[in-house]
């Protein structure tokens, strides 16, 4: 009869700030393939058989907790948080989690929240190693790497038994030459872990409570079972934007391989010129091209297939798929696209909307103004809060010269209107649908210039009969 695996709880360490990310967002909430990295770690723990997951939060705890609740809230108490009030080391972080662990859990799986490539199969192997380890109170993953800089080194005795871990900053020159390292994945028996955490001290180079020190205690209490990881890449932690990008490429590769095997062709790329500047927390999606002196502000999003040349995009703006823009500016919180075309000298101010199949040229669209569908807006000034309906055309060219159109704040331009420049439409004015405007419209006035509708009863029947007879001849 097969032995039942040990019931376990996972503890995920996610309290760190991640200063090398240079971001206001907590490190573990940075996304890969559309999901925060932390969610991949939680998924791996659950897939490896954890009955519940305790995530230790600290920096940005409200944001992290909210993100977890949104993603895993439907699972009730299966995923919950524990607060680490001060960053006093990984050992202290696990201490903070202990009161939140169910008393029925016999083992505790400890993971880092910045390792989104974790393979659940490797975690399952670790679980099996602890079950086979007899009296050993802990099992851990180790990895052989070519450059161990920054990692804790695995210390073994003459017989090859693991006797401890030495953090890089505390290691001697001889110990730093060791290439077997600690990737930070442990599975410890609950009773042992509680006692070991109580025995931790801050007698080290960083003055912190090192979780790694529990391995030396385990070696004296029955041994530490070590499983050498076959896939070292899956254990890599994310500390900066370059590592985030590399990990995302791995994840995209996994997704692409799966889809390609099902018959899908996938091509992904982004091209960014050397002169382009992009601020923290901006998102540049696939197949985006950023050229020249383009600037993208903090938190802005440039979506799939967009091409921007010498464009300033302010903080929080959204450029939706397949937008083309050049020598223009997009204000904070503005929304552009999809399928918009901003030609040179377009100025889209804060919170304005330029929608699908709208073209602008030498036009100012002031704060909160909207042109959401099918319009040409050339040589114009559209006032704050004005609305330009679908099918509106600024008739700005007489064959020899360009002329300007001015629309006042809060004005409403009905669909399928033609504005023959030069012309001014006053603040709060209303242009009826289908109107051709050739003269100035005063403030709060209604301009209507369409032909009066006439209904001829029975005419359609007679017309169709006549056309049918003509077709027979």
Swiss-Prot record:
* EC number(s) from the headed UniProt entry: 2.7.7.23, 2.3.1.157
Residue ranges of region Linker? 242-262
Q: What does the record give as the reaction this protein catalyses?
A: alpha-D-glucosamine 1-phosphate + acetyl-CoA = N-acetyl-alpha-D-glucosamine 1-phosphate + CoA + H(+); N-acetyl-alpha-D-glucosamine 1-phosphate + UTP + H(+) = UDP-N-acetyl-alpha-D-glucosamine + diphosphate
- Span list, region N-acetyltransferase: 263-473
Biological process (GO) annotations held by this record are:
cell morphogenesis; cell wall organization; lipid A biosynthetic process; peptidoglycan biosynthetic process; regulation of cell shape; UDP-N-acetylglucosamine biosynthetic process
> Any idea where this protein resides?
Cytoplasm
Ligand binding (UDP-N-acetyl-alpha-D-glucosamine): 13-16, 27, 84, 89-90, 152, 167, 182, 239, 343, 361, 376, 387
Catalytic residues at 373
Q: Which InterPro entries match?
A: Bifunctional_GlmU, GlmU-like, GlmU_C_LbH, Hexapep, Hexapep_transf_CS, MobA-like_NTP_Trfase, Nucleotide-diphossugar_trans, Trimer_LpxA-like_sf
**Where along this sequence does the record place binding of acetyl-CoA?**
390, 396-397, 415, 433, 450
State the encoding gene. glmU
What does the note accompanying the cofactor annotation read? Binds 1 Mg(2+) ion per subunit.
Task: Name the chain's protein.
Answer: Bifunctional protein GlmU
The similarity comment for this entry is: In the N-terminal section; belongs to the N-acetylglucosamine-1-phosphate uridyltransferase family. In the C-terminal section; belongs to the transferase hexapeptide repeat family.
Pathway membership: Nucleotide-sugar biosynthesis; UDP-N-acetyl-alpha-D-glucosamine biosynthesis; N-acetyl-alpha-D-glucosamine 1-phosphate from alpha-D-glucosamine 6-phosphate (route II): step 2/2; Nucleotide-sugar biosynthesis; UDP-N-acetyl-alpha-D-glucosamine biosynthesis; UDP-N-acetyl-alpha-D-glucosamine from N-acetyl-alpha-D-glucosamine 1-phosphate: step 1/1; Bacterial outer membrane biogenesis; LPS lipid A biosynthesis
